[in-house]
Amino acid sequence: MPLSTQPFVEANKDRLLEELKQFLRIPSVSTAPEHKADVRRAAEFVAQAMRDAKLENVQIIETKGHPLVYADWLHAPGKPTVLCYGHYDVQPPDPQIGRAHV
């Protein structure tokens, strides 16, 4: 972890861990139609986290599938552009994981 972020993480680790747990509790299984609302809820969670981080132009963009979450912060002219790309959905649990083998 870069030294510049370490004091922030140390000072906020309980809150950050609780926020991560809240996010992980959302069953955002994108391949399961019964979790469509949960995927939407996960997108809204991510959008709010971006707002809380002071990103700007936060948008939930509708698509033919699941929503896309976008934000930017364009206040560093002359500095390199950074693109962060990821997904906020999860895969269904593997029924074999966590089962006792007989």
Question: Which residues fall in each region the model found?
Answer:
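Acidic/His- and Gly-rich active-site-bordering loop/insert found
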Residues: 2-99
